[in-house]
Curated annotation (Swiss-Prot):
SUPFAM superfamilies: 14-3-3 protein (SSF48445). It comes from Solanum lycopersicum (Tomato). Homodimer. PANTHER family: 14-3-3 PROTEIN. Belongs to the 14-3-3 family. GO terms for biological process: protein localization; signal transduction. One of its GO terms (cellular component) is cytoplasm. InterPro entries: 14-3-3, 14-3-3_CS, 14-3-3_dom_sf, 14-3-3_domain. This is 14-3-3 protein 3. Gene3D superfamilies: 14-3-3 domain.
Length: 260
């Protein structure tokens, strides 16, 4: 029996998985971009969608962490009056910000040109619109002035569009709907400095999911309850922060592989 050669799409998906195992995040992004760009009007499978999300989350996550560390060092050196060090740090921070901008621009372009227009199901529409909101939010984390305002407005627009579809088409316990609520509430808290709205959104999502927990299927039970726990963690943190100035880590929607 003749062996059927894998298609270019299958080969790129396999190579993306290989790059993931090898922790070669940039290459993983490249392979999944090839898959996305080769589809025409066809949609990515759930597996492909998750691989793309993981690839970009790994690449952006490392640089977001670097930016936070460097910004913290910059503040300390500024308070000590070490101008020479501050100038060097600013140059380095600027380099990281350029990399962050490039990564965000890359995935946002792919989302607008391919992924969002070809999405047909409710969960894929919400998935990609949430992703669009996430990457505009990452831009808002470090941009300033008019650029920050623009990034924040784009985040809000994408999250609201995703929320409208999620409310109409996805169950309150659906992990994608819960992940959207988690990240949307983080946006209100961190970018818009609106703890009340952040807490209200997170609490509503948590309460609605709790009310329907008995209808949750076995396959998404683990994913959904994990995100519900993260919503509760943030609510606990934010309500205590309103009373004192805590500095614990705010939780965001984990990568698909972290839910397993």
């Amino acid at each position: 029996m003749a062996v059927v050669a894998p298609t270019a799409r299958e080969e790129n998906v396999y190579m993306a998985k290989l790059a993931d195992r090898a922790e070669s995040d940039e290459e993983m992004v490249e392979f999944m971009e090839k898959v996305s760009n080769s589809l025409g009007s066809e949609e990515l499978t759930v597996e492909e969608r998750n691989l793309l999300s993981v690839a970009y989350k790994n690449v952006i996550g490392a640089r977001r962490a670097s930016w936070r560390i460097i910004s913290s060092i910059e503040q300390k050196e500024e308070s000590r009056g070490n101008e020479e060090h501050v100038n060097s740090i600013r140059e380095y921070r600027s380099k990281i910000e350029n990399e962050l901008s490039k990564i965000c621009d890359g995935i946002l372009k792919l989302l607008d040109s391919k992924l969002i227009p070809s999405a047909t199901s409710g969960d894929s529409k919400v998935f990609y619109l949430k992703m669009k909101g996430d990457y505009h939010r990452y831009l808002a984390e470090f941009k300033t002035g008019a650029e920050r305002k623009e990034a924040a407005e784009s985040t809000l627009t994408a999250y609201k569009a995703a929320q409208d579809i999620a409310s109409a088409e996805l169950a309150p316990t659906h992990p994608i709907r819960l992940g959207l609520a988690l990240n949307f509430s983080v946006f209100y808290y961190e970018i818009l400095n609106s703890p009340d709205r952040a807490c209200n959104l997170a609490k509503q999502a948590f309460d609605e999911a709790i009310a329907e927990l008995d209808t949750l299927g076995e396959e998404s039970y683990k994913d959904s309850t994990l995100i519900m726990q993260l919503l509760r963690d943030n609510l606990t943190l934010w309500t205590s922060d309103m009373q004192d100035d805590g500095a614990d880590e705010i939780k965001e929607d984990p990568k698909p592989e972290e839910k397993n």
